[in-house]
């Protein structure tokens, strides 16, 4: 899954507002950047969060898997005289780029970037016709590969879980029938079919294709897996007293972050099957409220902020634990490798 001007935006909205990073004030307050500190921005995007961190005197290691974002940030590297390192990398690999003595902070802003949405040739938006691609990097399986090759049952699971689509079976079966005649090549091909199969009703607030496009983007880029790996990598890479700040725009992503901080709080959750579970040392403690949403004022000024949620944790002195992906309760979906051309 990964920007507004700091990182990401929800993909159901319009054009970019790169001068308004979502929850910027709250992110900086949670990170507490200062001279001498090293902060890793795992989702550089257009550099909004990175610039705000640099403005506080901290040094920044910024990552982005998108080569276009890296190229766009080179001027910022030059302008900041060695305090910014900009690296093309998935944020799940952040531990590889952390200094040996650890990081003072990590910020992750999860989702697709405004720049990516704006470029029709990237294929992220049904509002702009282009190749059905959706890859955040330049390699790997595209959305067209998934739509044209995946089994109907796999499409149903992808649309239903990753997109929370209410009629995944109806759409998947229509795709199967249509692709037998000719393959899907463009965003308009897919969006047009979905509009026919599940036409928009007067009460609907979003386009009929919104959830399917979201599901494909999340699947193609393994966004939930990337996020889960990045959280464990941050746990290993932060110094005691280091801060992990994560901004999400969708309930699936927020659920993963919430479960991570809950598991790493050290307070075990018992059940009727296993009522007595031993507490473990806390690896993260909450910073402020467990969850922060955008203010009414920010949501009005920047519609993308309406769905944004911020969660933050303070790294304790407890040693990192083994990465246990079962805590996220993610379903087994189809293999991307089997869908390549």
Swiss-Prot record:
It comes from the Bacteria. It is an enzyme of class 2 (transferase). It holds the Pfam family Methyltransf_5. One of its GO terms (biological process) is rRNA base methylation. InterPro entries: RsmH, SAM-dep_MeTrfase_MraW_recog, SAM-dependent_MTases_sf. GO terms for cellular component: cytoplasm. Its EC number is 2.1.1.199. Gene3D superfamilies: Putative methyltransferase TM0872, insert domain, Vaccinia Virus protein VP39. Belongs to the methyltransferase superfamily. RsmH family. This is Ribosomal RNA small subunit methyltransferase H. The lineage of its organism: Bacteria, Pseudomonadati, Pseudomonadota, Alphaproteobacteria, Hyphomicrobiales.
